[in-house]
Swiss-Prot record:
Pathway where it operates: Amino-acid biosynthesis; L-leucine biosynthesis; L-leucine from 3-methyl-2-oxobutanoate: step 2/4
UniProt-listed GO biological process terms: L-leucine biosynthetic process
Source organism: Pectobacterium carotovorum subsp. carotovorum (strain PC1)
A Pfam family it matches: Aconitase
Record keywords, A-Z: 4Fe-4S, Amino-acid biosynthesis, Branched-chain amino acid biosynthesis, Iron, Iron-sulfur, Leucine biosynthesis, Lyase, Metal-binding
Protein's name in the database: 3-isopropylmalate dehydratase large subunit
């Protein structure tokens, strides 16, 4: 019987597997940030250990950095301590750090791919749940906890059990204006926020192949939001064209050899998946979440569902609780709902393609009265490229705030956050209660939909603005 891409990647990295024991995997890349690493480095220090492979370990500051200044003190005392600890730890243990003043600094899941640290066939870990992003390149990438961060720093290995496999095929062509964010939200709407639990998901089908690498990263980034361990897209010419010439990508003859190997990284035709889900891309409309998990999502032109319409009692109770928290009524359309803030950024949607899509809607328009809209590029290189293209001027002229790179309003760990009761159209990945600030209300959308909300003051069907 044939093997899935996940099975091939897993088996290629097994270092040791004894009967009735969890396999030990080799880790090719370890990405580190300021929040989940301090205790891990302290553990090394306490035991007198070194980082086993500093050349395969890369660090940046992203979660609690200010997006308005490069002052390490700007986000408060705890943030300052975490960033100073990262500086100290990377210097002591010989780890490459992209600090606040480095031109490549940015969100860890943006800088890895754009520097070519992320390559097909790798195992990649980070103390961050959205490490699944890197699976867009055909790499097995997943988030780990702080104790596991220490284990990888010390040994370059990690114990991992085998996951079940899920194939999600999106057939046909996506309509004009439908983005990877709409596709993945539609998928999660179908599977539910726990539909992928215990699985590694492989995304495939004509609509997936048509996506850029930025789009595929958005897709895999949110695999975790359906409960999956990781998300994968098999590498192809789109992948290779994106990677060629990047700093850490192979060069010359090594490049040719790498591509030859990367072309083998796909599921066999006769591979068996534990679960298969199929969607028709032609049926996907712009998506907006209405509740407090990413699976509580509808098309922008649909009505908010009545909790009584859910047959499952847990879903019914969850929907009722979500509507109360979000201060929404069943039966209304989100196009009638006003917003207070707009956030365009995060490891889901802060790449150059995302900013271009938002700028296309913002151009020649103005942010609605009473709305604060911020645009946060995912890295220094993204910011530089956007400014070379004049996107910053488009946003600023429209009334958006143009910020410095960082995780920003995706999570309330810095100065960018919602006040209680504020409603936000956000391009991030989680709409949990309090995620963007205590009692804040988050609606997940694509960058174009976020820009449309900014200029209309409410959720709007971006297809009507184009």
């Amino acid at each position: 019987m044939g093997k899935t891409l996940y099975q091939k990647l897993f088996e290629a990295h097994v270092v040791h597997e004894a009967p009735n024991e969890t396999p030990l995997l080799y880790i090719d890349r370890h990405l580190v940030h300021e929040v989940t690493s301090p205790q891990a480095f302290d553990g090394l220090r306490a035991m007198g250990r070194k980082v086993r492979q500093p050349g395969k370990t890369f660090a940046t500051m992203d979660h609690n950095v200010s997006t308005q200044t490069k002052d390490i003190n700007a986000s408060g005392e705890m943030a300052r301590i975490q960033m100073q600890e990262l500086i100290k730890n990377c210097a002591e243990f010989g780890v490459q750090l992209y600090d606040l003043n480095h031109p490549y600094q940015g969100i860890v899941h943006v800088i890895g791919p754009e520097q070519g640290m992320t390559l097909p066939g790798m195992t990649i870990v980070c103390g961050d749940s959205h490490t699944a992003t890197h699976g867009a390149f055909g790499s097995l990438a997943f988030g780990i906890g702080t104790s596991e961060v220490e284990h990888v720093l010390a040994t370059q290995t990690l114990k991992q059990g085998r996951a079940k496999t899920m194939k999600i095929e999106v057939t046909g062509d996506a309509p004009h204006g439908i983005t990877a964010k709409d596709i993945v939200l539609a998928i999660i709407g179908k599977t539910g926020s726990a539909g992928g639990t215990g699985h590694v998901v492989e995304f495939c089908g004509k609509a997936i192949r048509a996506l850029s690498m930025e789009g595929r990263m958005t897709l895999c980034n949110m695999a975790i939001e359906m409960g999956a361990k990781a998300g994968l897209v098999a590498p192809d010419e789109t992948t290779f064209n994106y990677l060629k010439g990047r700093q850490f990508a192979p060069k010359d003859a090594n490049w040719d050899a790498a591509v030859a190997y990367w072309n083998t990284l796909k599921s066999d035709d006769d591979a068996q998946f534990d679960t298969v889900v199929t969607l028709d891309a032609a049926q996907i409309a712009p998506q907006v979440t209405w509740g407090t998990n990413p699976g509580q999502v509808i098309a922008v032109n649909q009505e908010i569902p009545n909790p009584d319409s859910f047959s499952d009692p847990v879903e019914r109770a969850s929907a009722a609780k979500a509507l109360a928290y979000m201060d929404l009524q069943p039966g209304i359309k989100l196009t009638d709902v006003k917003i207070d803030k707009v956030f365009i950024g995060s490891c889901t949607n802060s790449r150059i393609e995302d900013l271009r899509a938002a700028a296309e809607i913002a151009k020649g328009r103005k942010v609605a009265a009473g709305v604060q809209a911020i645009v946060v590029p995912g890295s220094g290189p993204v910011k530089t490229m956007a400014e070379l293209e004049g996107l910053d001027k488009v946003f600023i002229e429209a009334g958006f705030e143009w910020r410095l790179p960082g995780c920003s309003m995706c999570l309330a760990m810095n100065n960018d956050r919602l006040n209680p009761g504020e409603r936000c159209a956000s391009t991030s990945n989680r709409n949990f209660e309090g995620r963007q600030g205590r009692a804040g209300r988050t609606h997940l959308v694509s960058p174009a939909m976020a820009a449309a909300a900014a200029v209309t003051g409410r959720f709007a069907d971006v297809r009507e603005l184009n």
